[in-house]
A protein has these predicted regions:
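Hydrophobic, membrane-facing alpha-helical anchors
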Residues: 13-29
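Short aromatic/basic micro-patch
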Residues: 151, 212, 249, 283, ...
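Helix-loop-helix junctions within the multi-pass membrane cores of secondary transporters/permeases
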Residues: 1-14, 18
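Cyclic nucleotide-binding regulatory domains
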Residues: 266-335, 343-350, 354, 365
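The feature marks cytosolic C-terminal regulatory regions of anion transporters and related permeases
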Residues: 24-189, 193, 199
Length: 384
């Protein structure tokens, strides 16, 4: 019954009511922004926007509501002008300049050398919002009719608003009517961009065949589709061992002799052929399926793809010849079949059939030379 105690109680109740009302007054956009940050989306744009919110709140508390609103409007105008003046499309080129890391047999590579010009790559940077979305639409309008795929690399995009998401959906539909396919690199169902697009009601169908974790995978999918459209055999087709790159220039009897020194091994999808750091005592000839060489032994999203091999090619020869351990791991992308040749088997052929062994070493050298030439050519094209 003490009046002072009653006063404290009333003040506490009023304070709670005021805090509840204050929290309810926070706009949904800020709630969503904080939710994105708490959900792990820590991009530069999110940090910048949170900093602006904190700045405006601090000015409001310090100088009052009117000054806070004025400061918020001024900062928003400055950020808007900067984003409007920033070019959303950082670079534009074709897959001729930036092909995938998959290595193809010579016949397929010869076809793709020109066909890659039909894969247009647009690297985006900044925020995809209503002000920049229109510029992206204009960029897409000037893409030639000969293009088969348009790949948007969204890894440099900090945020996507509702208008940006709608533009991507409309762009996908519009290109589809023209017989072209839109691919989004840097977008998966678990990625913030993927969640944002679906939250805005876009790209709701699942699973998505046009979303890829990175640009390399998107370009590879486009290359494989171009090969399929042209009726050229893909990696699922088995290739005879004598038609592989290791057996070039050998007659039937020599092929049989070398094959007698090799062992066949079948791999299930996802099975490891060798791990990073393993002893390098074999080279492998892939006759069916596909094998990818990756760095790191952790979860898939933490591993870096170096190269993927198609049927008919050899791998693991460099580490075997120099005697070092495996510098990366290799995993089967799908059911695969490989023939392995040990260093001891190659040495035995050298003693018993010097001319045959010389041809094998020559084929290995040509294989390595072709990979080096390809890497050099790509670097020269990328640097102008």
């Amino acid at each position: 019954s003490n009046p002072r105690v009653k006063g404290y109680f009333i003040e506490a109740v009023l304070a709670g009511i005021m805090l509840t009302v204050a929290v309810a007054m926070v706009d949904r956009w800020t709630h969503r922004l904080i939710g994105q940050w708490r959900g792990g989306e820590r991009s530069a744009d999110v940090w910048e926007t949170l900093a602006i919110v904190a700045f405006v709140c601090a000015i409001t508390v310090w100088r009052g509501f009117a000054v806070g609103v004025a400061a918020g409007v001024l900062v928003a105008l400055l950020v808007f002008m900067r984003n409007m003046n920033r070019s959303l499309v950082r670079s534009r080129h074709t897959a001729v300049i930036e092909p995938s890391r998959r290595v193809y047999p010579q016949a397929q590579e010869d076809f793709l050398r020109e066909a890659r010009s039909r894969i247009v790559l647009l690297e985006l940077e900044g925020a995809l919002f209503f002000g920049s979305a229109e510029r992206l639409a204009r960029e897409a309008d000037v893409i030639g009719a000969d293009a088969r795929f348009v790949v948007l690399d969204l890894r440099g995009v900090g945020s996507i608003d509702a208008s940006g998401a709608m533009l991507l959906q409309q762009l996908s539909t519009g290109l589809g009517r023209r017989g072209q396919t839109l691919m989004l690199a840097g977008v998966t169902a678990e990625h913030p961009h993927g969640r944002r697009l679906r939250a805005f009601g876009c790209f709701r169908e699942a699973p998505r065949s046009d979303w890829f974790a990175d640009l390399d995978r998107a370009v590879e999918a486009a290359e494989l589709q171009l090969l399929s459209d042209a009726g050229i055999a893909l990696g699922d087709t088995a290739i005879a061992l004598q038609d592989s790159s290791l057996f070039v220039g050998l007659d039937a009897s020599q092929c049989a002799l070398v094959q007698g020194h090799m062992q066949m091994r079948r791999l299930a999808a996802g099975e490891v052929l060798f791990r990073e750091g393993d002893p390098a005592d074999h080279l492998y000839v892939l006759t069916r399926g596909s094998i990818t060489v990756v760095a790191g032994n952790g979860p898939e999203h933490l591993r870096q793809r170096f190269v993927s091999f198609s049927a008919g090619l050899m791998l693991g020869e460099t580490a075997m010849l120099d005697g070092g351990g495996r510098s990366a791991g290799a995993t089967a992308d799908a059911e695969a079949e490989v023939f392995q040749l040990t260093q001891q088997g190659l040495d035995r052929l050298g003693r018993e059939q010097p001319a045959l062994a010389s041809q094998l070493y020559r084929n290995i050298a040509v294989h390595l030379s072709a990979r080096l030439r390809r890497a050099t050519s790509l670097r020269r094209q990328a640097t102008g």
